[in-house]
Amino acid sequence: MVKSMYAYVREAWARPDKSDVKALLWDRMQVWRREGSVTRIDRPTRIDRARALGYKAKQGIAVVRVHVRRGGRRASRYVRARRSARMGKNSSTPGKSIQRIAEERASVRYPNMEVLNSYWVGQDGKLKYYEVILVDGHHPSIQSDKNLAWLANPTHRGRAERGKTSAGRKGRGMRTRGRGTEKTRPSIRSHANQGK
C-alpha cells in the first residue's frame, strides 16, 4: 500500500533528532528566537499534526507560534525571615503544563478567537515552542462547517483558561476514568485537592 505524504511527515517528526527535521529546526530556531512570544504564521509547521487536531485551510482559522520558558516556576526569592533551606525554591512548579500556558497566552492575544488545540514544534535550552490552532466561532465559514460549528456556542467561551482543551484535560486528570482517578472528579479541586 502506498503511503501518503502525511505519513512521511509524521514519521519524520516522530524522531526529529534522527531525521531531516533536525537540520530544519537548527535553521528555524535562529529565526524563532528573535520573534515575539506569540507570532501568527501563514501555515502550520507540522501539517499532519495540525490536520489531525482539526485544522483546515479556510477563513476563520489561524495558527500562531508561542514560545514559553522551559523548566519550573520562576518564583521570586524571599527577602526576609527564612533560611535558604526553608524557602522551598528548588521544587516550586506551576499547577499547569507549559503547553497549557502557551494556549492561554495565545487566547489572551486573540480575544475574539477560541483555542481549538495545540502541538509541540521544537525546543532549545531556554524555550519550548508550540503552535496553537485558533478558531473564530462567529465567522460564517466556521458556522457552516459541521465539524467546527460547535465553537460558535457561548458555552465554549474561554476554553483554554478553563482547561477544556486536550492539554488542559490532561493536566486536570480527565484523560482516564475509573480506578485510580476517584479524586479528579467532579473537578481537580474536589476532595480537598487530592487529585494532584
Curated annotation (Swiss-Prot):
Residues 167-178 have a biased composition (Basic residues). Transmembrane segments: none annotated. Residues 156-196 are annotated as: Disordered. SUPFAM superfamilies: Ribosomal proteins S24e, L23 and L15e. GO terms for biological process: cytoplasmic translation. Keywords: Ribonucleoprotein, Ribosomal protein. GO terms for molecular function: RNA binding; structural constituent of ribosome. The keyword DNA-binding does not apply. InterPro entries: Rbsml_eL15_core_dom_sf, Ribosomal_eL15, Ribosomal_eL15_arc, Ribosomal_uL23/eL15/eS24_sf. One of its GO terms (cellular component) is cytosolic large ribosomal subunit. NCBIfam families: PRK04243.1 (NF003269). HAMAP family: Ribosomal_eL15 (MF_00256). Belongs to the eukaryotic ribosomal protein eL15 family. PANTHER family: LARGE RIBOSOMAL SUBUNIT PROTEIN EL15, RIBOSOMAL PROTEIN L15. This is Large ribosomal subunit protein eL15. It comes from Methanoregula boonei (strain DSM 21154 / JCM 14090 / 6A8). The lineage of its organism: Archaea, Methanobacteriati, Methanobacteriota, Stenosarchaea group, Methanomicrobia. The gene is rpl15e.
